[in-house]
């Protein structure tokens, strides 16, 4: 259940629970980067997010978070998924990611989402 009144927006760092999952999907309670617009989430109750792992192993479709943010680790851009913000626990983790980092994440998303 989302904190009262909070609607995730692009660039927010949040905590959520990704369970249940299947196969190699990221699971469990973990931070994530919101990549969908606030208006989308407000109208649909869904947020598109990229999970974050604390195990940093640079991979072409991942982005390491810079120091100084409230969450440390690596954004798993290739694990992008939508979550139901009304059915899953969603907690704001802190400040929005810097614009240059958001641009890198966007470019990596575009590199493999080609429709």
Please state what every model-predicted region is:
Residues 1-115:
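Conserved functional hotspots at enzyme active or ligand-binding sites that engage polyanionic ligands
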């Amino acid at each position: 259940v989302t904190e009262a009144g909070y609607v995730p927006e692009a660039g927010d760092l949040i905590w959520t629970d990704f369970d249940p999952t299947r196969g190699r999907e990221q699971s469990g309670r973990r931070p994530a980067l919101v990549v969908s617009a606030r208006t989308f989430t407000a109208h649909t109750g869904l947020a598109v997010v990229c999970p974050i792992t604390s195990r940093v192993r640079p991979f072409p479709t991942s982005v390491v978070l810079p120091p100084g943010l409230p969450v440390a680790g690596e954004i798993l851009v290739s694990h992008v998924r939508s979550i139901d913000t009304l059915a899953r626990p969603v907690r704001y983790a802190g400040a929005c990611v810097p614009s240059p980092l958001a641009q890198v994440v966007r470019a990596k998303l575009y590199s493999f989402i080609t429709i």
